[in-house]
Regions:
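Histidine/acidic residue-rich metal-binding segments in metalloenzymes
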Residues: 1-40, 53-69, 89-105
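Active-site beta-loop-alpha junctions enriched in small/polar residues
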Residues: 16, 21-28, 44-47, 76-78, ...
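Conserved, mostly hydrophobic/aromatic
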Residues: 18, 43, 71, 98, ...
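A conserved active-site cap/scaffold subdomain adjacent to cofactor or substrate pockets
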Residues: 65-79
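Short acidic/histidine-rich active-site segments
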Residues: 74-75, 102-126
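Outer-membrane beta-barrel pore domains
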Residues: 82-88, 116-123, 137-145
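Mid-to-C-terminal alpha-helical segments outside catalytic/metal-binding sites
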Residues: 124-193
Length: 193
């Protein structure tokens, strides 16, 4: 935990976003406790709707909201419906679930089209975003809400990450690179002293 804490503090000092997609729930929890800047999940979905270990559980979504961070919904069918088949309605369900649990300020789009082979029917690529937005408008989303979802929330997080960086610079916070000693005590590890 000490190394993770040091790495996250240094990322905050440098103005780097902490991306928690692909990490364990324990790492999520620790990162959310430590980070002074908002964190993101760049391409994850809601665990409550599809219990993939790549998705984010509700307690973590609530912690994310307290942190000011953002989860960007992944459109990989196996993370939406837990199968190779999904539809735009599955994506809408994840977006709405995250909105209910974390709030409109904390949900975005992180489709992942560049690395997935099973996409939702009706949402096969970004050219289908108007279909997604029409579905969301049909269930009560406003244009302002869609603006946040489509990139406004991400811009807010970027600005807040930079604000934390600027505050640390103004306070004279030095690099954390010497804390702790990252060299292994293992004599067979080539990085040991």
């Amino acid at each position: 935990f000490v190394r993770l804490q040091t790495i996250i503090r240094e990322m905050n000092r440098l103005g780097m976003m902490v991306d928690l997609s692909h990490v364990s729930t324990g790492t999520m929890r620790h990162a959310l406790e430590v980070s002074e800047a908002p964190v993101i999940f760049s391409h994850s979905s809601a665990y409550e709707l599809c219990n993939s270990s790549r998705n984010v559980q509700d307690d973590m979504l609530k912690s994310l909201a307290k942190n000011g961070g953002l989860i960007m919904v992944n459109f990989y069918s196996k993370f939406l419906s837990c199968s190779e088949n999904s539809t735009v309605h599955d994506a809408v369900a994840h977006i709405n679930h995250i909105r209910r649990v974390a709030g409109i300020e904390h949900v975005g789009l992180g489709a992942g089209y560049d690395g997935i082979n099973f996409t939702p029917k009706g949402l096969e690529d970004v050219s289908a975003y108007p279909t997604l937005f029409a579905e969301l408008l049909g269930v009560g989303w406003s244009i302002e809400d869609l603006t946040k979802l489509a990139g406004g929330n991400f811009l807010r997080v970027m600005q807040q990450v930079e604000k934390v960086r600027d505050e640390k610079k103004a306070a004279g916070v030095k690099p954390y690179e010497d804390h702790p000693n990252f060299r292994s005590d293992d004599p067979y590890n080539c990085t040991s002293s």
